[in-house]
Amino acid sequence: EKEKSKEKAEFAKKCLEEYADFVPMFLLLDETARVLRKKRMTRGAVDFDFPECKIILDAKGRPVEIKPYERNAATMLIEDCMLAANETVAEDYYWQQIPFLYRTHEKPDEEKIRRFAILINNFGYSLHIGNGEVHPKEIQKLLSRAAGTPEEAMLSRLALRSMKQAKYTTDCVGHFGLAARYYTHFTSPIRRYPDLQIHRIIKENLHGRLGEKRLSHYGKLLPEAAVWTSSRERLAEEAERETEKAKK
């Protein structure tokens, strides 16, 4: 353990020396990310921090080691900036009234959330529900109260199951889990089709090529693309789960 700590310290020192010119920028970016994170949590965003693992494979694809995935300061910084970019782009194009793909997370079903509230009462927890609806801030406060308790993992999973699945839509109806009025997937065009499609729209718009014909084209294309990409996402998640089971 001491040897690992020493290696980490030496690696950190080497990085600081190698990227010395960028350190002030990184520190400023970290400060900005903390402000963004605080603002997001204040409005009620829910952070499901489930433990994840990564499976190390050999050259033949056989598992040789399973390591916990560490969510460190760097990954959180990237996440905060990514979320801010996604929200900014979504709001900008919503007000421009241009056909677009949004990442939507609808409010939980009234009956599901009521059943969840009844269930957690058995563990001494409560959930404020007004007019059949719950604010994401209530879920956030519940998970905060349960943090560090034996039932934390169970309550987190039950809370997640009480919510609807996120999907792609052409209507901007907000993202419940992030407590965001505007949200899209913009930051990963190299690995997600919705992001790539959005980049195409943005590029055409910036170059002044979004005339009536192109707007009509996207108006017809995007509803089908939203349904198709949402269904592909479900299949990809299922394939990922099955692969992890097989490798473990």
Over which residues does each language-model region extend?
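Conserved, carboxylate-rich catalytic/transport cores that coordinate ions
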Residues: 1-248
